[in-house]
C-alpha cells in the first residue's frame, strides 16, 4: 500500500493531483489514517505530527503522485444579518459559544443546531439550511499551526500544541 508522508498547502504550484479524498471538516485533523480515495484506491497517511488539512491541500504520495484534499458537503446553517455590524454581533455570539464557524463577508456558516438557530433568529438573523463544503476559521490556538511555514525539502512541520 502506498504511503503519504508529506503534503503541500493549497495553492502550491506544481503538478496536477492524480486523485482526491473528500473529508468533512471534523475528519481533516489527521496524523495517521487509511484514506479511501475517490477511485476506490487506499493510501496510508503517516505523518510525524497531526495536521489540520484545508480544502485544496495536496498529499504527497511516496511514488510522487499528489492527492487533493477536498472539503465534503455538510449540512449547515447559512446566517445572514441586517448589516455588517449585526453580522459582527452574530459572530460574537457564536464565538462566545465556541462554535466552529466559517465567517465570510456577507454570511456565516455553522453546523446545524436547532437551539442555536432559535437563538440567532431571536437576535434578528436570517437562517437558512444549506449543504456545501465547510471550512471553519481556525481558532486562536491554531494560529501558529497554519500552512505558511515551510521547512524545506517538501516537508512541512506543524505545531498544533
Swiss-Prot record:
Domain of life: Bacteria
Gene Ontology annotations for the cellular component aspect, listed alphabetically: cytoplasm
Name this protein carries in UniProt: Urease accessory protein UreE
Matches recorded under CDD domains: UreE
Role of this protein: Involved in urease metallocenter assembly. Binds nickel. Probably functions as a nickel donor during metallocenter assembly.
Entry keyword Chaperone: yes
Entry's family note: Belongs to the UreE family.
Source organism of this protein record: Agrobacterium fabrum (strain C58 / ATCC 33970) (Agrobacterium tumefaciens (strain C58))
Keywords associated with the record: Chaperone, Cytoplasm, Nickel, Nickel insertion
Localization, UniProt: Cytoplasm
Gene: ureE
Molecular function in Gene Ontology: nickel cation binding; unfolded protein binding
UniProt GO BP: protein folding; protein-containing complex assembly; urea metabolic process
Residues covered by region (Disordered): 138-161
Chief location of this protein within or outside the cell: cytoplasm
